[in-house]
């Protein structure tokens, strides 16, 4: 399935357990492999990661391997612990 990057910008991101994470701000590309490596997530201050980052007004990188579905919203596997799979941007 092909999808345009512009089609996922500003889409809300939720865990598979229906907890709000944030919104897609941008996409990270791995130019060596030619694949999307992660999503840059904004609106962290309103999502489930706000207590796990030092500055919730910043953005975080969500590794692409955590994404389970892309549609009207983006679904991700919930982190196993406070920092699993999430990197500060």
Curated annotation (Swiss-Prot):
Top-level lineage group: Archaea
Protein name: Uncharacterized protein MJ0916
Pfam families: PRC
SUPFAM superfamilies on file: PRC-barrel domain
